[in-house]
Amino acid sequence: MLTNVEIQNIIPHKYPFLLIDKILEVEPGKRAVGIKNVTINEPFFQGHFPGNPIMPGVLIVEALAQTACVAGLMLEENKGKLGVFTGIESMKFRRQVVPGDTLRLEAEFLAFKLGMGKAKVVATVDGEVAAEGQIKFAMIDTNKKA
């Protein structure tokens, strides 16, 4: 298990854009399972939507991507790199996520070679699928000159 502080030592995201509270399971370069406790204090609920707060789907996808990044960046060859989206495939949203929900975030790598990868991702609340699909990503070295 990884705490929020440990996660911040692996991926560069910080509040308010760090969307993982803890990692329950991780196999570097293979898979990760994370948790996001959704509270009414999230900044995005101020405008999405007043009186009917719903977590934006794109932020659920971002939370899934951050979970995948933890697994990818824990590999020795990727330490210090930046995980970035290169594509989103077949993403489906099946349930609204609201304040009080605990979002379980699962990412399983389908392919990962030479810093490029594809992962199957699923977000659930109480065992019910909120979002599922596939994402593509790359691990880039921000210190290299173009």
From Swiss-Prot:
Matching InterPro entries: FabA_FabZ, FabZ, HotDog_dom_sf
Pfam family, one: FabA
Catalysed reactions, semicolon-separated: a (3R)-hydroxyacyl-[ACP] = a (2E)-enoyl-[ACP] + H2O
Compartmental location: Cytoplasm
Ligase is among the record's keywords: no
GO-annotated molecular function: (3R)-hydroxyacyl-[acyl-carrier-protein] dehydratase activity
Catalytic residues identified in the record: H48
UniProt keyword terms in alphabetical order: Cytoplasm, Lipid A biosynthesis, Lipid biosynthesis, Lipid metabolism, Lyase
Lyase found in the keyword field: yes
Primary location group: cytoplasm
Domain of life: Bacteria
A biological-process GO annotation: lipid A biosynthetic process
Enzyme Commission no: 4.2.1.59
Cysteine disulfide links: none
Gene Ontology CC annotation, any one: cytoplasm
Family designation: Belongs to the thioester dehydratase family. FabZ subfamily.
Chain's role: Involved in unsaturated fatty acids biosynthesis. Catalyzes the dehydration of short chain beta-hydroxyacyl-ACPs and long chain saturated and unsaturated beta-hydroxyacyl-ACPs.
This protein's name: 3-hydroxyacyl-[acyl-carrier-protein] dehydratase FabZ
Organism: Acetivibrio thermocellus (strain ATCC 27405 / DSM 1237 / JCM 9322 / NBRC 103400 / NCIMB 10682 / NRRL B-4536 / VPI 7372) (Clostridium thermocellum)
